[in-house]
Each structure stands twice: as structure tokens, then as C-alpha cells.
């Protein structure tokens, strides 16, 4: 496997604004991964200001993410959230099959339940040259999920496609 599925790859074939690509990508990725919600968090690594730029939900019963305005990241976030700390350190993306049983050194169960409410997730780190520019987070709410090799491949491919677009988006909006 070396290529993205064509429905996802086609999104990147035209010259579009990053926000338009994100809005088009998330619903298709949600269907491809069979998940309940996907959001894209973007951040300026110099100022540590970030926001959710796009969120897709399978149904309206799935909770939305309410971080659509630029805001300063709490200084305590990396201490509270080991997934975010891993992302800040440009570690490989993390695939969590079950928040309830995950290693507490990797997942703060209480933080995940309170903040996001999901059961399984992918914490895809959008990094360049050791700097975190964003996080793509597909997730499942009803039950744990075993992430397949094909899911991992899609995320790895998307990380390389999305990261430059996130950087462009940040540079366009954070002047």
C-alpha cells in the first residue's frame, strides 16, 4: 500500500484553500475510517495559540468540539494530557483502541472522558522539523476499536499531505 484511496487523494489534486480542503476531507475520511467524529486542531508552535478549524460528526448526537476560536493553550495541557505531550515532542501518531484500558502513561483516562468523551481514537501528529502544527483526531464513541493496518496507512499518508496545508493555514490566519 503506497497510495491514499482515490476519494481522499482527489481532494489534494486541485489548488484550493487549506480550509476548503479540510472541510472536504473530514467527512470522506470519517466514512473511510468508519468513525464517529473527526476534528482538526491547528496551532502556531511559536505562540502556542490554537483552534479547531474543522470538525465532522457522523450524527448530531455526537458531541461537537467547541474550540473554534483562537485561544492560548493552557500551560498545564502537556502535563494533563500525555497524548498532547507526545505530539509536542513530535512523537509518532498514537492509535488508542480503548481509552478505558490504555496505558495511563499514554492516556489520561479522566482527561479524555471529561474533555472528549470518546472510547477509541487516533491522535495524528502534524509536525514539521520537530514542531507541532496540528492534530487530526478521528474517534469512536460507542465502543473500543481496533485500528487496522489500512487505517494506520491512511493516517500516515494524510500526515504528509495535511501538515504543509496546516502550516499554510496558520501563516495565512496568524499574521
Residue ranges with predicted function:
Residues 84, 126-141:
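Sensory-domain boundary capping and coupling elements
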Residues 1-23, 31, 52, 168-175:
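Signal-transmission linkers at sensory-effector interfaces
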Residues 97-120:
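Signal-transducing coupling segments at domain and membrane junctions
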Residues 39-75, 79:
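GAF sensory/regulatory domain recognition
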Residues 119-127:
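A short, aliphatic-rich beta-strand micro-motif
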Residues 9-16, 25-34, 42-44, 88, ...:
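Short regulatory alpha-helical segment in sensory/regulatory domains of signaling proteins that mediates
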Residues 139-158, 165-174:
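Regulatory loop-to-helix N-cap segments in sensory/regulatory domains
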Residues 85-94, 101-104:
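Soluble sensory domains of the PAS superfamily and closely related sensory modules
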Amino acid at each position: 500500500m503506497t497510495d491514499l484511496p482515490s476519494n481522499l487523494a482527489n481532494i489534494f489534486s486541485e489548488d484550493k484553500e487549506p480550509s476548503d480542503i479540510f472541510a472536504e476531507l473530514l467527512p470522506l475520511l470519517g466514512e473511510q475510517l468508519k468513525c464517529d467524529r473527526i476534528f482538526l486542531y491547528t496551532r502556531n508552535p511559536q505562540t502556542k495559540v490554537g483552534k479547531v478549524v474543522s470538525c465532522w460528526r457522523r450524527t448530531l448526537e455526537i458531541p461537537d468540539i467547541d474550540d473554534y476560536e483562537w485561544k492560548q493553550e493552557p500551560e498545564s495541557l502537556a502535563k494533563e494530557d500525555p497524548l498532547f505531550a507526545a505530539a509536542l515532542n513530535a512523537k509518532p501518531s498514537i492509535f488508542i483502541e480503548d481509552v478505558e484500558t490504555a496505558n495511563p502513561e499514554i492516556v489520561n483516562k479522566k482527561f479524555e472522558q471529561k474533555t472528549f468523551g470518546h472510547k477509541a481514537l487516533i491522535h495524528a501528529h502534524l509536525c514539521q522539523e520537530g514542531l507541532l502544527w496540528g492534530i487530526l483526531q478521528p474517534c469512536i464513541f460507542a465502543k473500543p476499536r481496533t485500528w487496522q493496518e489500512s487505517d494506520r496507512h491512511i493516517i500516515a499518508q494524510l500526515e504528509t499531505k495535511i501538515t504543509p496545508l496546516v502550516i499554510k493555514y496558520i501563516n495565512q490566519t496568524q499574521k
